[in-house]
Amino acid sequence: MAGEPIIKIEHLTKHFGGGRDEVAALEDINITIHSGEIFGVIGLSGAGKSTLVRCVNLLERPTAGTVWVDGREMTALSPKELREARKSIGMIFQSFNLLMQRTALENVCFPLELAGASRKDAEARGLELLELVDLKSRAGAYPAQLSGGQKQRVAIARTLATNPKVLLCDEATSALDPKTTRDILRLIRDINQRLGITVVVITHDMKVIEEICHRVAILDHGRVAEEGTVEEVFSRPRTEAGRRLVYPDGVPEELLRQNWAQGGGRVIRVAFNGGTAYQPLIASLAIDCGVKANILGADTRNIGGRAFGTMLLGLPEDDGQAAKALAYITSQKDITVEEVPDYHE
């Protein structure tokens, strides 16, 4: 379970450039991340995700606001104090940033050597970490001899060498195929559970958030649009930015024409979760209410072992029939309904 706050971002603002060329990358960001949790930050390209995570370890210095990590105000530290504080913050990237002339083991040992560890101690720790990421058998391989997933495992092992309390993952799976992505996400979740490391995941991919995160913040044009548990945000998005991420695909014009041709009128989005995801809603509408609805689209996903999904329905054009259908659907447990005007591509 998540513990006390370990990262506190307060009124963080980051601008680039100046004068007429000034660009606001982040505006008044307030986020608290608790010890031991996996926290996701998601948004479309240009939302400010990578800038935000780089402000956590002060790779980017905020224009205004404060960042606290493990009880230290990062924005107030001297250069020497900042170097010391960064030892407790690991970071992995989309590009693996391995030293090509060093073996996997030598890459993992590198930060230990910089910290003054003896060669013997560094190698012992390096082998231990390669075993943790299931890559001990490839300790003598060079990066060019490793697959993308194996390179990322080496990068993860290397960032764990200094025993960080926080692991920042900036699009860490974006360059990987789907199967390798799942493997790396399972590894990150295992590290979180076994070592208690707090993980911050930056991604544009909802599936990554669904797979491993406990809570999530949606960034939109440099601001936090929504924040909450993954279940809350993905099952019932409250903002337009949230809906764009959770419901990215429109209904093709052809399906809308078919809906109208079959006597359909308004289009509604039904969001359901838990056991309700498998209730025969359409059949129940027809049997219990005598109302026929057209299915224009449906999607179900698994979040934390529970089924969540959405269904786009074309209601009858007749207002009485449509009202009866809406009353029936809204009476069901754990179901939310919203009308979707002009919902098409």
PLM region descriptions:
Residues P178-T180:
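Helix N-cap at the start of a conserved alpha-helix in ABC-type nucleotide-binding domains
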Residues E227-G228, R236:
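ABC ATPase "signature
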